[in-house]
């Protein structure tokens, strides 16, 4: 969850060195004052039934996060570099990517902060759900059952994955009720 705010100065005032490097200036921004000047809007909520092909998560340690999701969710590594990993089920390029591009000192996510509160992963059977629970318990990952077919799993970075049995409508097609 990052945004860069800047205002370009005229090129004539840039600090351009003989070797072509441009030396930038970073100054503290009075973010709260600027926020107070703006129009307040309701938080953005995805439309009901929105389905994602894949998501990217900011984590403190991409290797640790990748191994966690591989062990607990049964995903496979598709491609990794020292600061990121792309993992998936089956032959898909990636369902989940984790990266540490926000910094190695990234604090665990806390409930109530801006950004992704949780994402939903649907599984096809109770056995699959219980296997995820077993794998999570082996890693001592926090689990909170919401009902008999839905739980929240918290990863080492404080990111919540809501896992539930797939729901079907009268046309027998998969859909997500969450917004």
Where are these regions (language model features)?
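Glyoxalase I/VOC metalloenzyme domain signal
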Residues: 1-79, 90-147, 154-179
């Amino acid at each position: 969850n990052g945004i860069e705010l800047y205002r370009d100065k005229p090129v004539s005032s840039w600090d351009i060195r003989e070797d072509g490097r441009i030396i930038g200036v970073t100054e503290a921004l009075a973010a709260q004052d600027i926020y107070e000047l703006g129009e307040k809007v309701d938080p953005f909520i995805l439309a009901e039934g929105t389905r994602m092909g894949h998501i990217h998560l900011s984590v403190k340690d991409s290797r640790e996060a990748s191994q966690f999701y591989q062990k607990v969710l049964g995903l496979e590594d598709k491609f990794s570099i020292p600061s990121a990993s792309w993992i998936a089920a089956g032959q898909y390029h990636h369902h989940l990517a984790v990266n540490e591009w926000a910094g190695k000192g990234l604090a665990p996510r806390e409930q109530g902060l801006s950004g992704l509160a949780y994402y939903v992963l649907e599984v096809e059977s109770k056995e699959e759900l219980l296997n995820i629970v077993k794998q999570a318990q082996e890693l001592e990952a926090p689990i909170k059952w919401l009902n008999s077919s839905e739980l929240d799993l918290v990863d080492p970075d404080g990111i919540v994955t809501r896992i539930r049995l797939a729901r079907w409508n009268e046309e027998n097609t998969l859909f997500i009720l969450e917004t």
